[in-house]
C-alpha cells in the first residue's frame, strides 16, 4: 500500500519540481532582459559645424561604447536657431528617449522644453552652457567666468599692462560666452587701469564670416587697436582672418577661445598669443555618464567643472596642452 502511494505521489513531485524550476528560469530571464536593455540617450549640441562640437560628439560616443547605451546625435545647423533646437528637444521627448544631454543655445528659450522633458520623467543633463533655474539633474561645463579671467590676464601680460583693446562678444543669450566676456571685462576694468577698451558691446554672431566682417569694420574704425579678445572658436578665427587681411596678424595681440587646426597653426606662428582651452570630449563623455548614473540610481553631482587651461606659443607642445589642442576624436567621429 505504501509502495502504491509512493508511485502515485512521484509524478506529482516531478511536476511540482519542474513547475518551480520553470518559474525560476522565467524570473531569471526577465531579470537578464531588463538589465540588458539599452538606454536610449539624445545628445543635442548648439550646432554641428565647429570642431568643438565634434569633440563633444566623440566624448558622447566614447561613453556610449563603454557604458553600453545608444546615443542619438542631433542639433541645429546654426547656433542661433532657437526654434530648431527646441523642435529637436520636443522630438526626442515624443520619441520617449531615456535621457537627454543638452547644450542650450539660449539660456531662456530652452527652459520650457527642458521642464517638459523633466515632467515626462526624462532626465536632462545640461552641458557647455547653463540654463536659467536648476530644473535639470546636472550641469557639466567649463568654469567660463574663470576662462575669461585667464584671457584678461594673458592679454594684459603680453601688452605689458597697457594698451587699447577690443572685447568682441559672441551672441546674446549664450550663457557660456556671456560668462567668459563678463570674466574678461571685469578683470580688465578692475585690475588693469591702463588698458582702454575701445569696443566692448559688439557681437560677432555665430559664423566665422560674421566675425570676420565685424572685425574688419572695427579695424577700419580703430586702427590704433593693440589687442583683441574673442570668446569662442568662430569669433577667434574670424578675427584672425581680418588681422591677416590687414597685415596685422602677430602685431595686434589676439587671445581667443577653443581650438581648430587653423587656430593651432596661427598659435605656432605667433599670430595668436593665447587660446583658452576647454575639454569638450570630457564634457560629452560625462554628460552621457551622468544620465546613465541617474537612471541606475547612483548619486549625480549637480555641478561638474571640466577644467580650463591657457595654451600659448611657448607651452603648446606640452603633452597636457597638446591633448586639449588636438583631442583624439578619430576613433569616434570623422
Spans of features found by a protein language model:
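Short beta-strand elements in bilobed, periplasmic/extracellular small-molecule ligand-binding domains
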Residues: 64-78, 165-167, 190-205
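Hydrophobic alpha-helical
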Residues: 93, 101-118, 184, 204-266
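Short, solvent-exposed amphipathic alpha-helices that sit
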Residues: 52-66, 147-151, 175-195, 210, ...
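Flexible loop/hinge segments that line or gate small-molecule binding clefts
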Residues: 107-146, 157, 164, 170, ...
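Hinge/cleft segment of the Venus flytrap/periplasmic-binding protein
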Residues: 24, 30-37, 175-176, 187-189, ...
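Short, low-complexity disordered leader/linker segments with a strong preference
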Residues: 1-40, 65, 93, 115-122, ...
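Hydrophobic alpha-helical segments within soluble ligand-binding/sensing domains
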Residues: 85, 140-165, 179-182, 209-212, ...
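Extracytoplasmic "Venus flytrap"
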Residues: 40-59, 63, 67, 72-86, ...
